[in-house]
Amino acid sequence: MFDQTTNTEVHQLTVGKIETANGTIKPQLLRDAVKRAVTNFFAQLDGQEAQEVYEMVLSEVEAPLLDIIMQHTRGNQTRAANMLGINRGTLRKKLKKYGMN
């Protein structure tokens, strides 16, 4: 559903700001991309009722996010979990969910 775009983690990215070593990044571009993708999704429904949209959106965002972070950390789960702001056990559960373990 999304081009290159986790429950609490995504919420933090899209409505808050990301703290980096060099300062703060406001992820307006990510928010705009998600908004466009969800708008396009509903436009394509052609009057049909959508089911479980929340879970679908989260999984469509979470999977590529995890993939990119794991690449960035070269598979270091401790570093990845710290970057995401979640504990390593939660990260392992999410990686398993998406077949990335």
Curated annotation (Swiss-Prot):
DNA-binding region: 77-96
Transmembrane residue ranges: none
UniProt cross-references to Pfam families, sorted A to Z: HTH_8
Gene Ontology MF: a single term: DNA-binding transcription factor activity
Keywords (A to Z) from UniProt: Activator, DNA-binding, Transcription, Transcription regulation
Family: Belongs to the transcriptional regulatory Fis family.
HAMAP family named in the record: DNA_binding_Fis (MF_00166)
Function text: Activates ribosomal RNA transcription. Plays a direct role in upstream activation of rRNA promoters.
Subunit structure: Homodimer.
Protein name (Swiss-Prot/TrEMBL): DNA-binding protein Fis
Organism whose genome encodes this protein: Shewanella baltica (strain OS155 / ATCC BAA-1091)
